[in-house]
Amino acid sequence: MRGGGKKNASNVEPLRATRPCAECGRPSVREHYPFCSERCRNVDLNRWLSGSYAIPVADDESKADDEDER
């Protein structure tokens, strides 16, 4: 091994660039990415579990399926 095998923590590059927290806008941290804290991560999870977030469905797709069955 060259260099003794030890790495200096200041030379380690982050895995990804810091982005604003998806919940509050503060800089995200690696442990809770893309959030800044466990609190923001749990707030977002609660919104998904309570149904506050929903993936929209186009009405045209359901009408097209009905016509195919005829």
Swiss-Prot record:
Protein name, entry field: DNA gyrase inhibitor YacG
Co-factor binding comment: Binds 1 zinc ion.
Family: Belongs to the DNA gyrase inhibitor YacG family.
Binding positions (Zn(2+)): C21, C24, C36, C40
Record-linked SUPFAM superfamilies: Glucocorticoid receptor-like (DNA-binding domain)
UniProt xrefs under InterPro entries: DNA_gyrase_inhibitor_YacG, Znf_NHR/GATA
Sorted UniProt keywords: Metal-binding, Zinc
Metal-binding recorded as keyword: yes
